[in-house]
Amino acid sequence: MFERILVAVDGSTNSDRAVEAAAEMARTHGSTLSICHAFHIPEQYKTDLADELEEALESDAEKILTHAAGVAERAGVTARTVLLKKGHPTEAVIAYADELGVDLIVVGVRGKTPGQTRAMGSVSGAVTEQAGCSVLLVRGR
């Protein structure tokens, strides 16, 4: 049913739960699993410090993706990871899902990214409304 699954992560505990759920589904159904993390630097923050800010965000993002891949690996699934840096996270996740031709996007609800609160809540809601495929929302325990 779901041959290609994409899970969007933000480094939160709920994000880990989303990876666990996606990995379990992928393992059970023999699906491919991709994990993405998206960040965007708004124009008003593109100043002389933009390069340093982007480097810091990229470093954090790589740690988030490495951790998420480890969560999937512990669930018995090897996942492909990708960092999305262009556009708003919602748009980036949906565009990447379309590019991959995924059947299911999995997101945690009410996650957070550094410097933001409840970011994944807004992203998960927007992905649910705008995605061209099924979306699974995973709540924390």
What do the predicted segments below correspond to?
Residues 52-63:
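A short acidic, glycine-rich active-site loop
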Residues 70-105:
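Structural beta-alpha unit
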Residues 37, 108-110, 139-140:
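Short secondary-structure boundary segments
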Residues 18, 45-48, 91-94, 117-118:
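Short, well-ordered secondary-structure micro-motifs
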